A protein has these predicted regions:
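Intrinsically disordered, low-complexity segments enriched in small/polar residues
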Residues: 3-266
Length: 266
């Protein structure tokens, strides 16, 4: 079996694929921001308020539902007034190269890139994944070409969540990721060619809110964001070495009950 490591470091989710390549490291941070009211008015962009704290499910499994323990993953607390955006970073940092990944993201059982029901496989047409580091952040669900809705906390079982609206069921709250590294030989060939690839200058860490001109607001709690097309070609992704992680979103009372109020990583 392939050794794939998923760790929490400084409240970032870190996926490492050492058997694929020593530089095959993908980091996902969950950035706090304010929720934009969904009332058909335009609002200025909310600020970035730092990272959400996170904790491993297995560290608190005695206080969690059995189904969560089976699925594993991590916990994240979110207030009703908050929203989150995802920040992606790859490689070993400065001078370490920026290893490309295909990342599938589901909120509930809905694919955040396509807005369709979730499937476990990587799909080429229509592209149902983002490519990082080319796509340095994601602010929400795709709801149309260039338009997204914020990732916000909603109580399950009241018909509010994207999952319930599309599938009519409320089984899987939270956010699910499947991360696929580029195949080793494709990465090595790309490095040798030293193509002027946009991936190699886009992988800084965007800890601040993204630049205004790339995001603009549309009415009704919508924001503008393009999903970048896969410029590498579908066959470069190593589908034999994917890694999956489930992020359970709790409200503050649930978080305190599960973790004893302990804020990890501080």
């Amino acid at each position: 079996g392939v050794i794939i490591m998923i760790e929490l470091k400084d409240d970032e989710l870190v996926f490492e694929f050492p058997k694929v390549h020593k530089e095959a490291v993908c980091r996902i941070a969950f950035q706090r921001t304010l929720r934009i009211p969904d009332d058909n008015r335009e609002y200025p962009l909310p600020p970035g308020l730092g990272r959400f704290p996170m904790a491993h499910v297995e560290d608190h499994s005695a206080r969690l539902p059995a189904s969560w323990a089976e699925r594993g993953g991590v916990l994240l607390p979110m207030y009703q007034a908050e929203a989150l955006w995802l920040n992606f970073d790859c490689g070993r940092g400065f001078g370490g190269g920026n290893y490309p990944f295909a990342v599938k993201i589901a909120a509930g059982k809905i694919n955040a890139v396509t807005g369709d029901a979730w499937s476990n496989d990587l799909v080429k047409e229509p592209q149902d994944y983002i490519v990082v580091p080319d796509q340095p952040w994601l602010d929400g669900f795709s709801v149309g070409k260039g338009l997204i809705r914020q990732f916000v906390a909603m109580p399950l079982g009241r018909g509010y969540t994207a999952e319930e609206q599309i599938t009519g069921a409320a089984e899987h709250g939270g956010i699910q990721f499947i991360v696929y590294p580029m195949k080793r030989e494709c990465y090595e060939a790309m490095r040798e060619d030293s193509l002027p690839d946009i991936a190699f200058n886009l992988c800084q860490s965007y800890e601040q809110s993204p630049a205004l001109d790339s995001m603009g607001l549309a009415p009704g709690g919508l924001m503008r964001q393009e999903i970048y097309e896969d410029e590498y070609g579908f066959d470069v992704w190593d589908t034999d070495n994917s890694s999956r992680c489930f992020v359970h979103v709790l409200n503050s009372a649930q978080w305190t009950a599960a973790t004893g109020g302990h804020t990890p990583g501080r």
